Amino acid sequence: MQYDNVSVADRIAEIKDTFSPDELTSVSSFVLLCSSGTLETTSFFEFLHWWALSDYSYKGCVEYLMKYKFRNGQSSFAINFFRESLATGKLKYEFNTPVSKIRDTKNSVEVTTRSGVTYTASRMICTIPLNVLNTVAFDPPLSSDKKAAADAGHINQCIKVHAEILERDMRSWTGVNYPNNKLIYGFGDGTTPAGNTHLVCFGGQHNHFEPEEDINQTLEALRGFAPMDIERVVSTRSSI
């Protein structure tokens, strides 16, 4: 297709003269909020796909991508799936068991763990994250396309930082600091049970950092949006 090999950086280069500096910053930062990659590694075609699913409007993007979410977080959604399966009495599971090898004999599938234990089944569903797929030996090997994807890795290097702050007037705030700040996009997400403001801020592959490794760097990135009195910080990553 026409846009299969076009990045967002390519497309922005074509139309950048139609933007003011502030508009260019807004467009670039919103794309990176969605992809958590870089403009060069974000597919323009995939972003068109998102735009179509959001009714071809920024309002749709906000409603479908940000406004509505699980009340108790995505982890609660996964936990409820697990509990429902467990309630059937037919689920067997094992945690903290890295896989080292998967062998498909056509009649059965063998999964061998790093500790040397082998499990056999008639079929298997593989949900190993892309960025760790190369740590597992497959027999027969992965297809060339899947191997190429595993070698490239996932471009999404999302950083999500939650901050509880005292400034109540920021509970409906939205801020952008691109390209210099380590957190690109942030917005107020209501109030905490203590009555303070809850901020959610995002970074990605651009100016990537690990929030939990240096709290002072994380605080500096948060205050890169606006002065704030920070009570508490929690960070998560979605880059596996």
How should each PLM-predicted stretch be described?
Residues 2-98, 137:
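Active-site/ligand-binding neighborhood in enzyme catalytic cores
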Residues 35-43, 77, 103, 132-136, ...:
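Short catalytic/ligand-binding loop motif for oxyanion handling, primarily in non-cytosolic enzymes
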Residues 40-41, 118-120, 206-213:
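Short, surface-exposed beta-strand/loop "edge" segments at domain boundaries and coil↔beta transitions
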Residues 92-110:
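A conserved short coil-to-beta-strand element within the FAD-binding core of flavoproteins
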Residues 92-94, 119, 234-237:
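General small-molecule cofactor/ligand-binding pocket signal
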Residues 99, 118-133:
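Short hydrophobic core segments
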Residues 114-116:
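Glycine-centered tight beta-turn/hairpin loop motif at sheet-sheet or coil-to-beta transitions
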Residues 132-240:
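C-terminal segments that line or cap access tunnels to active or ligand-binding sites in enzymes
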